[in-house]
Each structure stands twice: as structure tokens, then as C-alpha cells.
Swiss-Prot record:
Keyword Membrane on entry: yes
Membrane-protein topology: Lipid-anchor
GO annotation (BP), single: protein insertion into membrane
Name used for this protein in its record: Outer membrane protein assembly factor BamB
Organism: Shewanella oneidensis (strain ATCC 700550 / JCM 31522 / CIP 106686 / LMG 19005 / NCIMB 14063 / MR-1)
The gene coding this protein: bamB
Domain of life, per lineage: Bacteria
Amino acid sequence: MKSWCKNLLAAGLSLAMLSACSSSDVEEEPVSELTAIQATVFPEVSWSASVGDGVGDYYSRLTPAVRYGKIFAADRYGAVMAFDEASGEQVWRKDFSEEFRDNALAKNKGARLAAGITAARNKLFIGGESGLLAALNAEDGQVLWHVIAGGELLSKPTVADDVVVVSTSSGSLEAYNVDTGAKLWVYDMQLPNLTLRGTGSAAYEAGGFFIGTADGKVAVVVKNNGQAAWEQAIYNPTGGNEFTRMADVDMTPLILGDNLYAVSYNGNLVSMELRTGRIIWTRKYSSFNELTTAGLSLFLVDDHSRIYSVDRRNGLELWSNSELVNRTLTSPEVYKDYLVVGDFEGYLHFIDRSTGSIVGRIQVDSSGLFSQPIVVDDKIYVQGRSGKLAVVTLP
């Protein structure tokens, strides 16, 4: 199978869109086998719990949220749960399939949760493939309001003051009042003929929502009125077919001071001026994962699961690691002096962020890890495809 066909599968593109990838194409690029490492850190699972039935093999960007002394997590099928942050004891559980069976989900195929969780203003915000967006009381799980958005919700909602926005698969950014669910405005974005299955969440800064688009742009939308302040292409699609012209920005723009950083599939990693969108530098990388940062370094995982450290001042590559190629790595996150990433076999890898060397690993869930690890204080929270929620620490 051609490597770009395989990458589209990893990114969540539907199988129907892959009819152009024939078995007679170039042989499938192999998955890297894990090899012995010189371990210097020895992670442990502090506690774990089960979150419903997990997400199975479905595309999902469900991630836990840690706030208010609790950990909030959900499964694809409608179970939303809160656990005590210290002990892991279950505090409450809400079943969306039961809650909305006779109204919002009556004509759909169950909850199919895929977007969230976002915890803010003593509420939880979560959505799914049905278009359902719901706000819950963080204290007891009571549903405060719900709406049906104009398309599938595949990434976390973003909350800014009294507004929550969601990016839909139909190419719109929709804004709602956080307390009532009243729709405030809709910003429509151009949708190419073929896109990756996924959307990025918006970042918020200085009165604007910064959002990546499916046609290779970053746009800033004014919170108060839903109008675009500017749009800037970070990659101009080229190629002889729809696949090679895909240029989705399926990540949350990373804002650091007066600069914004974004990366596109098939395209570029860029540094932009926050106020105007002017591109400061650009480098050739292809990714649908989130960026993270520490010090003067940006860290990214590309569409082949290669890991990079890049100087955020000028885009110069500091190191790269190809030991985990095609292991369907999660987005990276910084933990102390390390970078942590999960893989499709459920291993959480610890990488020295100054050298790129793998210095530790632990298998958390053999069904695989699928979402970016969450780091709070000295703990790492990960969720596996089976529904296992685990807290990993270094002794």
C-alpha cells in the first residue's frame, strides 16, 4: 500500500475514500518494532479505572480533562464519568445514550462521542459525530443544555469567557452561550472535495478564535461577532490528484507570545505573526498532530510517526527520532525533562527532549493509546482504546 494511503488511514479518512489505493501499489511501509533501550526512567501506573467501553477502533479525539479535583473522561457510546483526582474513585456517571434516547439522539446511531472533554466555568463540554454538543455540571454530571450543531463534532470545544465554540466536519465554526446554549454566530470555512477525517480545535487569544481550516489556512474569528479578522494560507496545495492536494490544518494553533505556530498535512510548519498572520518562517513538515513546546523548542510528530524538535525562533531542526516510525503515535506532550507519546500498542514512551533519545517506556493498555497525554503537575493521564484510564508517574 502506498505510504500516503496508509497515512490517510491513520488520520481517520474513511475507507470509502481510499478506493484509489490498490493492493498492487508499492508495498506497505513496515511498522517499527520496539528495540531494547538504555532506560534511565522507570514509569509506573499509580492507578487506573475503566471508562465504559472505550472507543474501539474508531477515529476519536476524546481526551480526559483534569480540573476541580476530578478527572473527567468519556467513551464513544455515551458514558461520561468523573473520578476523584487523588484516589481514582468514581464520583459520578452520566449515560448519554439514555439521557438523549427520546430526543436529540432518536434519529442517530447512538451517542458516538468524539469531541472533548473541555472543562471550564464549572461545566464540561462534550460533543460527537451526531452533532450533539452538551454542557454538564462538573459537580454532579447534570445536563445543563444541549444543541445539535451543523455537522459532526470531532475535536474539543473551546471556551472563552461566556462563549463556547466548536468546529464541525461540514466546515463551520459555531459559537454558543456557555450558560444557555443559545447560538451566537456561525463562521463558514471553505471545504475541499477531500479532507482528512478530523478537525482542529480553536485557540483563543486577545478576543479572537484562531482555527485551522481544511484547505490549508489559519483564520482568526472575532469572538464578539463571528467575523474574520484575517486568513492566511500556510500551504498552497499542489499535486496531480485529490489525495496529494490535501492540506488540512487538523491541529490547534499554538500561541506563544506574539507568535502563532501551525502545521498542515502534506504541507508546512510555520511561524506566524499573531496580529497580522504574516508568515515569519516556514519549514517542510507534514502532520495532523498537535504541537507542543518547552523553552525555545517546538516538538511535533509527523504523519509517519517521526518525532522532531525544532527551534521556534527560526525553524531549524534540532533533532529527529525515527525509531517509532508508523506506530501511529499520539500527539506529543512535555513532562518534566521528557517528551511523552503513546502508540498503537499502548506503550507510553519517554524521550529526552534535549537529545531525542528514548529513555523509558511503559505499556498502559494493549489495545492502544489514541489521544494526546494530559500532563498536570507530576502526573500523566492517558486513555486507551479499551476504555482504560491510567495515571502514570515517575517514582
